[in-house]
Amino acid sequence: MESTTHITIQDKRRKLPSFLVIALFFLCSAACLAQNAGCVIDGKTKEPMPFVNVSYHTKGRLNGTTTDANGNYVLGLLSQIDDSVVFQCVGYTTVTKHKSELNGSDIIVTMQQKSFELNEFTVKARREHYRRKNNPAVELMRKVIANKQRNSIENADAYSYRKHEKMEVSLSNLNESMRYKAPFKKIGFIFDNMQESELNGKKYVPLYFMENLSETYFDRSSSSTPRTITTANRDVEVDKFLDQYSLELAMDEVFGDIDIYDERIPLLSNEFISPLSQYGILFYHYHIADTFYFDGDTCISLLFSPANQQDFGFYGKMAVTKDSLCAVRKVQLNLPYSNSVNFVEQIRFEQEYQRRDGRLLVALKNIVVDFHVPGVSAHGRKRTIYDDYVFDSIIVAKSRKLPDHVPNYNKRDDDYWNEHRIEPLTPNEQRIYDDAARLSGVTPYRVLVKTIMAVAGGYVDLGKVDWGPVENTVSWNSVEGVRLRLGGKTNMNFNEHLFFSGFVAYGLKDYRFKYNIKAMYSFAEKKYHQYEFPHNLLSLAYEENTTIPGQEFMMGTSDRLFQSFSHTGIDKMTFDRKLTLQYDYETPRHFSIKTKVEHLEQEPLADLDFTSVDGKTEYNPLRSDIFELQLRFAPRERFYQSYEYRMPINNTSPVYTLTYTYGTRLFGADFEYHKLKARLQKRWFVLSLGFLDVSVEAGKIFGQVPHLLLFVHHANQGYTYQDEAFNLMNYFEFASDQYVQLMANYSFNGFIFNRIPLLKKLKWREVCSAKAVWGDVSSLNMPSADNPKLIPFPTNADGEPETSTLAKMPYVEVSAGIDNIFKLLCLEYVWRLTYLDNPNTIPHGLRFRVHIAF
């Protein structure tokens, strides 16, 4: 069906080019005619001013741009601007112009200098085209980059320091009149702590606050990476059923741990090229502004901005010492208004260094972010203070005996905090703790939080029990028809260590009940549910349910609502009776061990037949018993932990997984075998070109098994795109007893579209992928007269085999698509390149997924 539609579209494409050319001509013409442009100049020197923030509101939403290296700016249609345009630059008085004053293509806006605490510079940009050759600013930056190692603390053989972090999240774009309106009417007291954003003057009310005290140690003789020990932590518990570990990780991912000396800067779940990167000379434009004194040093003020303002880069300024060190004393990073980052209106990061013991060491980091999603504005701030630097290997050696988190680190009293804070709380920060205690007792607020958690986590809180997953309540397939399911689980309100979960489901076509019951005991203390990191969990489960053989879904099960939409009927299913005893253990360093003992009975459904080749044995059910051991190592892994599943957060470290399975006849199973599988996953950021996700996997079976116990390759017959599946492969289409697999998904992060004048306004991002698997079924496991006890591969009504091997060639599919459509949708067109003659093959098709990212 899909291929027929595609052929029709292909025929029509012959008529499209002329239409597109005409349409693009009129669009470009309209854009050019509608542009209102001008130049911003210094009122005293009359020099053009680069990197001035030019902001305005469109239907209440903040928009804007930044002047280029020659001080020029371009606005769109003035009719789309609500009222006024604001021109802002550090060290200058803000200028506000009504839109009627900016109608034209040669408007001059004059800005006046004001006194500034750092003796702010005068911009002396030149009008000529930017050049890297013979550019004093570029030559200075080459010296700064060359001295990075010399000036970085990482150059020391041993060091330690203390760190105090304060993180705050607030509701923004508020005013006093909202205090008496829904939804704030019952919590109006939070407006008593209203503050003003230093970025844009918007009012905000803090709702969340977190503090963390830690000590970092490094000794080159014993380790290649620093070690951080958390000594104290406390936060505003928004509610007990929010996973604080995941919340803190997610916020840390948003705000990042920025070091200007790093090659790449992690921020907002992306990686930006640092102005001090070895590639910065190619990515940024640099301009020398002036010299000034800062804390006893003569410094050179240096301005920088991305060569292309839609790229993932910063504009800002830095103070570089005017000596042989060429070290950074202070830096400010900003995102251009025209940046391609989603949901972020403005962001500013500042980092300061101080001279201590003859070294320049980081003393302060401060980051402020203004977010906006439809209907909600938020303000975030993270302030980090450093102190007590020591360069002594003996002190560092003593830290080896300390755990990553000292005992009772999250139970420190006020006296401890008052004594050990590097920087005291401000009155407003203390007020957040007080307001949080009052919020927890307000019923409308609690209902709101529970609703958000039901949407985000999939479960509805009912006290001691959570109902869900909501998404699995209704689904359908060819065997069961409409499937209704009711499930739930207990939480820590029921018992601090013992947890239960389960479900009951019923098919309106097969008239059959399915159910699952599971008991879990957590040896580790948990805040709300048993799956919180790290695991130390023993579980016993029994299940009777329909399954798709060989399909291990990355998140959820086959009865998720989205899995119901399939281009081909799902009729290759079994009814499984499964008893599982499992123990999961993982360390804070992200090394995990999973052991499992399982008894499985599989009954064929629909078109499946489990009769042997010689017709003498009917495996109904097919019995298998296994002992399984899985080792997994994911150094520095970061993830969001929902009630059951983990979603990785911007992991660049490799993930290694090794699984060994022993199928035994000990409990009356039909076959004995050994199965080994290894997997490696890795993400690479490719400068400003986006990132590449790669997974390599291989497996081999030793012994004789029927096709259900082979490696049945992960397919996807739905219309949703899955990163970890072959999206045009049918269920049960290919099986192997030895194979190697490669999957590569690439995101350009808008690198191409950002250079196309009209497309860059849409903030679309290009994606592509290539996936391949090559394997075979050995003669020992091939159903034939030589193996009469094996089960033949399934066939269709015409007698054609619906399951085959990959002996002839690899299975290969590729895709290309557009991500970030409306900031939430990704569309990919997938092409299948091999085995096109197999039954029910779809050669190409459009797939979608919901993908929300910064």
Describe the residue ranges of each PLM region.
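Structural motif
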Residues: 35-49
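Short Pro-Gly-centered beta-turn/loop motif in secreted/extracellular proteins
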Residues: 49, 74-82
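Hydrophobic beta-strand segments
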Residues: 52-56, 85, 123, 161, ...
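A short, solvent-exposed loop/turn motif at the edges and junctions
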Residues: 56-60, 84-97
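Short, acidic Ser/Thr/Gly-rich low-complexity loop/linker segments typical of extracellular
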Residues: 59-72
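Structured extracytoplasmic
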Residues: 82, 116, 126-299, 305-313, ...
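Conserved "repeat-terminator" motif of extracellular CCP/Sushi domains
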Residues: 107-117, 121-125
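Exposed, low-structure sequence patches enriched in small/polar residues
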Residues: 270-272, 401-854
